[in-house]
Swiss-Prot record:
EC class (word): transferase
Cofactor note: Binds 1 Mg(2+) ion per subunit.
Record's keyword annotation contains Amino-acid biosynthesis: yes
This protein's name: Shikimate kinase
GO CC, one annotated term: cytosol
Binding sites annotated in the UniProt record for substrate: 36, 60, 82, 140
Binding-site residues for ATP, renumbered to this chain: 14-19, 120, 157
InterPro entries per record: P-loop_NTPase, Shikimate/glucono_kinase, Shikimate_kinase/TSH1, Shikimate_kinase_CS
Keywords: Amino-acid biosynthesis, Aromatic amino acid biosynthesis, ATP-binding, Cytoplasm, Kinase, Magnesium, Metal-binding, Nucleotide-binding, Transferase
GO BP: amino acid biosynthetic process; aromatic amino acid family biosynthetic process; chorismate biosynthetic process
GO MF annotation: an example: magnesium ion binding
Subunit field text: Monomer.
Length: 173
């Protein structure tokens, strides 16, 4: 991969987008961004607070702006929020400006990876986490599939192993 094209990681919460993104950026010597962290940095508040105050729609509006700005950069790895694909504008931007990699995981692995995480606003409800994750998968998985250039199952692999798999895929391009 002579030219450093943008790499965008999409997938559900708990798929490993941020962890794998950091690994990938280190191995490829590319700059790493996490859209959720960027929103937190710009607002000075955590994602849960933004959700509480502005609602999901307000958060998603911020997300569109951040994704638009970040994807204009060259040679970056971007870990997106799990719901970023809900907005057609984000899907179009991601598809047009880089290589989109769908990090796929099972509901069981998501439950395991997120069980102690209190920073995920969609899991802070009276509905069981399994039900929430199943509903999100039903809504979002087709959207991930729609824009993915590649799909990688992350369940039984380390972040480093997934990063190497991605690099191998990119070298074949």
């Amino acid at each position: 991969m002579a030219e450093k094209r943008n790499i965008f990681l999409i997938g559900p919460m708990g798929a490993g987008k941020s962890t794998i993104g950091r690994q990938l950026s280190q191995q490829l010597n590319m700059e790493f961004f996490d859209s959720d962290q960027e929103i937190e940095k710009r607002t000075g508040a955590n994602i849960s607070w933004v959700f509480d105050v502005e609602g999901e729609h307000g958060f998603r509006q911020r997300e569109v702006k951040v994704i638009d700005e970040l994807t204009k950069k060259q040679g970056i790895v971007l870990a997106t929020g799990g719901g970023s694909v809900k907005f057609k504008e984000n899907r179009n931007i991601l598809s047009a400006r880089g290589i989109v990699i769908y990090l796929e995981t099972t509901i069981e692995k998501q439950l395991s990876r997120t069980k102690r995480d209190k920073k995920r606003p969609l899991l802070q409800s009276n509905i069981s986490n399994r039900t929430v994750l199943e509903n999100l998968a039903y809504e979002r998985n087709p959207l991930y599939e729609e824009i993915a250039d590649f799909k990688i199952q992350t369940d039984n692999q380390s972040a480093k192993s997934v990063a190497y798999s991605i690099i191998h895929l990119l070298e074949k391009m």
